[in-house]
Amino acid sequence: MTAQPPLHHRHHPYTLFGTSCHLSWYGLLEASVPIVQCLFLDLGGGRAEPRLHTFVVRGDRLPPAEVRAVHRASYAALASAVTTDADERRRGLEQRSAVLARVLLEGSALIRVLARTFTPVQIQTDASGVEILEAAPALGVETAALSNALSLFHVAKLVVIGSYPEVHEPRVVTHTAERVSEEYGTHAHKKLRRGYYAYDLAMSFRVGTHKYVLERDDEAVLARLFEVREVCFLRTCLRLVTPVGFVAVAVTDEQCCLLLQSAWTHLYDVLFRGFAGQPPLRDYLGPDLFETGAARSFFFPGFPPVPVYAVHGLHTLMRETALDAAAEVLSWCGLPDIVGSAGKLEVEPCALSLGVPEDEWQVFGTEAGGGAVRLNATAFRERPAGGDRRWLLPPLPRDDGDGENNVVEVSSSTGGAHPPSDDATFTVHVRDATLHRVLIVDLVERVLAKCVRARDFNPYVRYSHRLHTYAVCEKFIENLRFRSRRAFWQIQSLLGYISEHVTSACASAGLLWVLSRGHREFYVYDGYSGHGPVSAEVCVRTVVDCYWRKLFGGDDPGPTCRVQESAPGVLLVWGDERLVGPFNFFYGNGGAGGSPLHGVVGGFAAGHCGGACCAGCVVTHRHSSGGGGSGVGDADHASGGGLDAAAGSGHNGGSDRVSPSTPPAALGGCCCAAGGDWLSAVGHVLGRLPALLRERVSVSELEAVYREILFRFVARRNDVDFWLLRFQPGENEVRPHAGVIDCAPFHGVWAEQGQIIVQSRDTALAADIGYGVYVDKAFAMLTACVEVWARELLSSSTASTTACSSSSVLSSALPSVTSSSSGTATVSPPSCSSSSATWLEERDEWVRSLAVDAQHAAKRVASEGLRFFRLNA
């Protein structure tokens, strides 16, 4: 091991300017005094390069009860205790976490300053450079100085592989996947209770351009990763470990928790082998220790002396930077999420002098998270899922007298395999007009900057690559709810105040708003007033600027507003806030960058197009170009050719099998068909419905639309990313699998038998994936939109019949469709020669006919598709 050199280039002999990167528990010394070690980044003060150091900090003496809680048992022992029930085991974990968290966040006045990681501080050390004696927030340090210093360091990318023993079930009991879910919660917890372990470990660290592989006790390799310094403190010998060139360790969200824990245990044994002094605490808390699982978050209270976290996939891991790591840690608002509410900081809100009385803006506070979806009650008609689960044949919606905003909540069929119970419904909005997605770009960041001091959180740090500032701010606000209720409520109230006034102003100006998400994203139609057309973008921008100045005063303009994209007016809300439609629903890459929508089944994966998107296609991209297309330019391209033509099999020797390399052009779609996931493909097809259904369609035309979805599925049938879904732990039947994976949100695919198959992005697609479940779900969405569209047309025509006492009988063709001033499609009623009763009777008959036609088309095309998938499995 190499010895750490002494400190250099101080502004004062004992003073350093920099930032705390991580606090970890070293141990208890004499008189129950806790010792915390601090990984500190010295900014260098412009005289030297930034350097990493490890110091120790004394905590306040612990009471005997907390000392016993620390010494009594490790996290693993508490989680696997056989003499206690599940509730008692959880209480034991929470009690241990509360003691450790209190010391690491509030153990002393110095620790309270250093616990606010990645914010500038000034410290003073003793003469030997071992203990921090004083610490205070650094004033006048530019944000750019911290960002520039972090850019010189890396994140260590860790990948661990290994072997597992066979799990032998007792002879008298056979544990099916269903019984595992009922009795153990997750496979991971069952394995923990039975002493599951890993062996033959091999680990790889990538730091910058260097890669280090450890398969044995290679101290020479470890010396390049960690510097070791032995010091004497309070008559005790300590060994301080400092990372070389990196400030955090990242793993993929598919890394087995057991392998990760075993890897750090092995490194601990090597680094402290033969050490006669007191080693640091070695413990681990992860989702595998909870009976029903938890967030994919890891808490190593003692060793390693760096933060450890997961990112979304190997590709993202390889691009992780130190700035991303800082953003991830800042978003925790304290310790990793797995620690729970006890691991969050107390943040005091700023005292605001607002131009609006408190009772006017505080009423808009809500417990909903930052990514919550708010639906317009007049645009969406909600219905509970009925007991009759016939294949997508919902009852007609009641007539609320609102013909322009026709939405119904529809039961979905999943073939027995679906995410949690909220998956049982769809909520659909369809309107023949261009819907705009208006974004208030920096609203959340600017409100947070007004409400929280920079020493608690600085929203203006430059993040890069994986994380966007908004995602970091959103997660930080979410974590304020646990121990900083006043700050959380203040921020949520101000965001809600602006958001509610935006939607109210839209309604007053004659604009139909359909949905808002996260206080900053609005789906709005243009409108008309007595003076002419009204732009949704102009309306939102004006309202935001007005109420921003009303709240905060001054000449500072309000947050930036812009139309992010526009598309046909089709939106489907699937289950709990999952959106499907012809829009760019991008949800980040996990971690702090991941929206809440990404942590549930059906969150969209980021798709990429190799070139510019064609004008009629909106698919998933990381950044929207704004404006977008109508989504209806490729109307009837999928009507012919059959599955073999779409799959590219041609006449390949008479074989029924197809080539997996079929180009997207074979779909009859645009180049962008190769991007996004299966929900993106469905959303693209949904965007074609308004243009297609302006005239009465035949069964063959309906079949062509369903077949287009099927063609897209066939072309991507071997693409793992296309089919992946993200499932919550303990909520589904999961097939047995190697390792410890299903204890946290994990990636998987549906199986035909109703189970979930754990699926890695980096392995071949499971052979028994349930393509039929995906087809069933996609066709259910399309059928729901077709039915709602028919109701919109017919409710508009019903309003028109009130002007006359009778109507003519419907002809064989659908009556002509015109566009009203508000952009809503209307059906011209027949001439006043038949009674209104006859018109209503014919209307209901047409609705039933269209619904039945759509269902028959879906069943026929689904039968074709399932036969094809079976032949080409």
Swiss-Prot record:
GO cellular component: host cell nucleus
Pfam families: Herpes_HEPA (PF03324)
Chain ranges passing through the membrane: none
Places the protein is found: Host nucleus
GO aspect biological process, one term: bidirectional double-stranded viral DNA replication
Residue span of region Disordered: 394-422
Name of the encoding gene: UL102
InterPro entries on file: HSV_HEPA
Protein name: DNA helicase/primase complex-associated protein
Assembly with partners or alone: Associates with the primase and the helicase to form the helicase-primase complex. Interacts with the origin-binding protein. Interacts with the polymerase catalytic subunit.
Keywords: DNA replication, Host nucleus
Similarity field: Belongs to the herpesviridae HEPA family.
Originating species: Human cytomegalovirus (strain AD169)
Primary residence: host cell
